Amino acid sequence: IEEKLKKAGFYYRVAYRVKAPDSMLDKLILKDYRRPGTENQDKKMQDLIGIRIILYYADDVEIVKNFLDTIFSMPGVWNTTEANEYEFRAMKINGIFKLPGYLSKTIVNPELGDYVDDTFEIQVRTNSFEGWHEIEHDMRYKGSAFGTGNEALARKMNSILATLELCDDSVVGLIEDLGHQHYKDRKWNYMLRCHYRLKFTREPLHPYIEEI
């Protein structure tokens, strides 16, 4: 994945993990996978392996999501949060992909085959939202720090999302403005870097372009 992202020129970081046995057991119990009569009775755990792609530019999120669908044998099954005008919510962009056969045989314990799927999860988010998600995951999803009696603080936690979204938009807008300034100054090399927001090599442009 990193090789493909690097070759395409994205600004990104990648984090990954494989669930530890105790973490895997906790989730199997919490989600009631395969337990008759529950909403997950026909489901398996799909994120034994988790990969997170952290992007520096917000408008790369959708591009990378579509890009990932092209580099594996099958497109991902995506779970995304739709934005609306009335509220700010954590934007979930998570994809489930099939593990290659040679990996699933070495990673997934056959004795857990009824409970753990031969898949992995990829999460895509921006650098601005990364820290918020980490705190929210530990305090709210894994614990109950924002439980009953802390509704006002939970709302305040969610309101931070609006600021982070503005920060993401501001960074993209600033680089676009910088590119426009370089265009007016006829600095084509810098203009192209700002316009596409990709990692180019340090080689100079073709002399024909430089002389325009």
Name each model feature, range by range.
Residues 116-212:
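An acidic, glycine-/histidine-flanked metal-binding catalytic module
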Residues 1-35:
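Surface-exposed, low-hydrophobicity interaction/linker segments
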Residues 62-64, 104-106, 130-133:
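Short helix/loop capping segments that flank catalytic or ligand/cofactor-binding pockets
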Residues 69-76, 143:
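A common structural junction motif
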Residues 39-46, 111:
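Short, flexible, solvent-exposed loop/turn segments with mixed acidic/basic and small polar residues
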Residues 77-99, 103-112:
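Short Gly/Thr-rich strand-loop-strand
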Residues 64-71, 110:
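Short amphipathic alpha-helices in soluble, non-transmembrane regions
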Residues 56-60:
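Helix N-cap motif at beta-to-alpha junctions
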